[in-house]
Amino acid sequence: ESPEISAKWSNELQKRAETLPYGIPINLSSDPRNGAKDSGAEFKSGGSEISKWPEGVGFAACFDPEVAGQFAKDASREYRALGITTALGPQIDLCTEPRWMRFVDTLGEEVEMSKKLTKAYCDGMQTTEGEADGWGKDSVNTMVKHWPGGGTGEAGRDAHYAFGQFAVYPTGNFEEHLKPFTEAAFHLDGPTDCASAVMPYYTVSYGVDKKNGKNVGNSYSEYLIKDLLRGKYEFKGIVCTDWGITQDPEKTIEGFGSRCYGVQDMTEAERCLLAITNGVDQFGGNSESGPIVEAYKIGCEKYGEKAMRERMELSAKRLLINIFHCGLFEDPYLDPEESAKIVGCEEFCRHGYEAQQKSIVLLKNSAKRAPEGQKGVLPLKKGLKVYIP
């Protein structure tokens, strides 16, 4: 929809929030929406009147963190003008498996470049210039994904479907996939210091948990969330599950449904409790509070009411901090006319077009590298000078 309509919708939501107990503002989130071409995939939507930029792997092709940083600065202004205060990204998976359908949104496969781009992206999104701690009216929380690295799917199969549930490490490079998180997103150069949220992926990181020997979805793994993310790497922000991991699984392996991998025998409430005790704060895509209330009751019986209340209040604190970051308690409302001037403005569109140009990679159809009996790597028509796939 148009920026004006988005701004009006945001204002109406915030008005409604004011009437509820405690009057806590709404923190709206969005998947990437500035791609030059809408992917058409179920996990991503384009923006109709927003500036257009390269996809994640296009930023990698620029070999220039400043381009990613400029995008993040411009996109954060557009997001705020639309009422969005959390970006479900950047997607900082090292894409060592090029057959994965989400390759396009990653920042490439090279760890050092990915780290530089991650820092530039998160700093640009989260930082409001002139604010001592970086947080302010132009800030958008970043939710880096997918812990502990989603570019590891077996044979490139995608974990939105049960046939892609396993992440594998045939060369033993698990730690390499952590580096964009542990050496970049959690140690930013800018004043906000750290990405404010993390999203674990659906996958079962097969054989990684040597402590408990459990092969379960990442959010259900005590080792990956409690011991590594919260413990060893001391991440203090929000942990939000990927979308739809708590419901019962689909009947067929091809079904696009719940991804409760490894904990299918539990009830939904038991799954919620397991994730909460690991250190998860938020359940992506869940709109029913019933299973979480039931999880709390089970937890009170198992751990005691005092312990469960303290645990729930800790998550509440983390969630509230990200709302305070963006100044929503001070003023959550937008001026629709001002939003229309910001979103897709000439300056941002020019920056996006320049980035698209810089991301283009020219390949030579070399005869030296061609298969036997072929005049080039690609079997193109004779006399063709330029080929655009």
For every predicted segment, state its role:
Residues E1-P389:
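Glycoside hydrolase catalytic-domain context in secreted enzymes
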